[in-house]
């Protein structure tokens, strides 16, 4: 599932501008044109982590206007190719606007660097509120209680529960924020792009659809390099159900090309959607089967006995990966609850136990 650290490092060191062999369109040192009408330029912004080495950021240009879809992570190594691509293309930052598919650091982290204060920034109100709430101590306390109730050690929460939470991706004060949702239209020159709700990876994850060309700027909704993580967030009853429904929504849109955020752009996105659906459904059934064989199992029992692409020993798993597994496992349990397939009962210590219905 995850690209090795050595391989990711090698890719990052090659730089974001190694595009010459990949396109019939215009190629610059730090960008690659991937579409005309509208003109779309791909900029790879490096950011080395466990599973990906770059964020695919897109510049949509029409006349003297430009919309940037995501910005990448806030590192000097990331800022350099994005700045260089903007300069190479002769884009006036005063005529730029921004669209954030979601507010994870590797997507929104360069806003403070690249976006002028007055630049319009289109984003999800749901994810914005989440970013604000997750920096509050009460949010972490409630998350700790939720995870502890599944039978995981409190130490795991303190080491891992703030992964992806509690650190704002940018400073919103004084920003020209434009909260958008399903059906809203963003205009760049003469180009109109429709906002599509693709919640799942985050509760407010958004995509942009250009109906004329069939392009979908899809963020982390569908990836080839990894299976997108589904975030455990307070107040969301069935993240898995929402995500699976939104995978189907993309298939029904009539898109021609999926422009995702990590890894190479590929044409076989429908096959990938089918794989992702099957991948999640297999794990859901595995959880149900374990509960059938072990009635009264705790959430931790179930999650630790599912198949994950990680070291076999729980203690050997990276904290960030461990947190993603805990999130994903609880989301599966929540989905089975929402589907009325299992029951969740707390014991005297408020530890949840599961049985089939």
For every predicted segment, state its role.
Residues 13-14, 37-45, 163-169, 189-191:
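Short Pro/Gly-enriched beta-strand edge/turn motifs at strand-loop
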Residues 50-52, 178-180, 199-202, 348:
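A short catalytic or substrate-binding loop motif that flags glycine-/basic-rich loops and adjacent residues
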Residues 66, 73-75, 165-172, 192-284:
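Metallo-beta-lactamase
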Residues 4, 8, 77-79, 84-186:
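Active-site HxH/HxHxD metal-binding segment of metal-dependent hydrolases
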């Amino acid at each position: 599932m995850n690209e090795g650290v050595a391989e990711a490092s090698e890719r990052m060191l090659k730089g974001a501008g190694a595009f010459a062999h990949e396109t019939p369109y215009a190629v610059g040192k730090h960008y690659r044109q991937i579409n005309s009408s509208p003109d779309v330029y791909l900029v790879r912004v490096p950011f080395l982590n466990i599973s990906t080495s770059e964020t695919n950021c897109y510049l949509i240009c029409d006349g003297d206007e430009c919309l940037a879809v995501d910005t990448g992570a806030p590192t000097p190594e990331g800022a350099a190719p994005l700045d260089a691509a903007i300069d190479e293309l002769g884009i006036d930052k005063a005529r730029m606007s921004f669209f954030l598919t979601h507010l994870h650091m590797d997507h929104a982290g360069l806003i403070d660097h690249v976006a002028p204060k007055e630049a319009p920034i289109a984003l999800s109100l749901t994810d914005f509120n989440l970013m604000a709430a997750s920096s509050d101590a009460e949010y972490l306390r409630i998350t700790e209680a939720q995870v502890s109730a599944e039978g995981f050690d409190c130490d795991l929460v303190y080491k891992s529960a703030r992964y992806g939470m509690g650190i704002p991706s940018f400073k919103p004060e004084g920003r020209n924020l434009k909260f958008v949702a399903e059906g809203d239209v963003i205009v760049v020159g003469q180009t109109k792009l429709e906002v599509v709700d693709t919640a799942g990876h985050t509760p407010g994850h958004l995509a942009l659809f250009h109906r004329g060309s069939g392009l979908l700027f899809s963020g982390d909704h569908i990836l080839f390099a990894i299976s997108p993580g589904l975030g455990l967030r307070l107040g969301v009853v069935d993240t898995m159900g929402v995500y699976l429904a939104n995978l189907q929504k993309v298939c029904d849109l009539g898109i021609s090309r999926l422009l995702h955020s990590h890894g190479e752009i590929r044409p076989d996105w429908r096959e990938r959607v089918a794989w992702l659906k099957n991948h999640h459904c297999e794990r859901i059934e595995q959880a149900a089967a374990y509960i059938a064989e072990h009635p009264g199992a705790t959430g931790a029992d179930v999650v630790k006995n599912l198949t994950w692409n990680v070291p076999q020993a729980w203690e050997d798993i990276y904290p960030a990966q461990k947190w993603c597994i805990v999130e994903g496992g609880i989301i599966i349990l929540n989905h089975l609850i929402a589907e009325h397939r299992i029951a969740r009962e707390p014991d005297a210590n408020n530890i949840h136990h599961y049985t089939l219905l």
